[in-house]
Amino acid sequence: MKPRMNGGYLVHHVGLLNGRTYQKLLKNESLAKFRSEQSKILTALWYCEDGCATFTDLSIKTGLANNTLTSMVKKLEEQGLVTLESCTKDKRKRYVGLTELGKKQKSIGEKVSYELGEQFYKGFSDKEVAQFEGYLERIISNLKDSNE
């Protein structure tokens, strides 16, 4: 019999601690206009070629369920960080785009992510970081394959 495998639990726990640590670091940024959970959506938009995406694209990139994504995008819109626009070709499609304020928040997000990465990998060599991330990519691939 194989020994008990705790990878799923450990990854889940890392995710929780990662989010809490991100939020703690974000609180140190007086110009930050977003919370750690919202950074998932903002990061996806910051790295879109044209700075906007459909709800479907954002759901895939962030892993958020549609109902969660909808309420979070609405809050980001109220905060003046994103805009919502209907597609001219297909009225059922709506695009989420960054406002100027949303674009300006990118440098804060990158700074906090860098600081988080420094804490996350404290004591790891470059080789260990590459190896660890390689394992995570394999796990993601395995799970994607099993969900197709």
Model-found features: residue ranges?
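N-terminal leader segment of winged-helix/HTH proteins
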Residues: 1-32
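N-terminal helix-turn-helix DNA-binding core of bacterial DNA-binding proteins
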Residues: 21-68
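Charged, amphipathic alpha-helical coiled-coil/dimerization segments
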Residues: 74-134
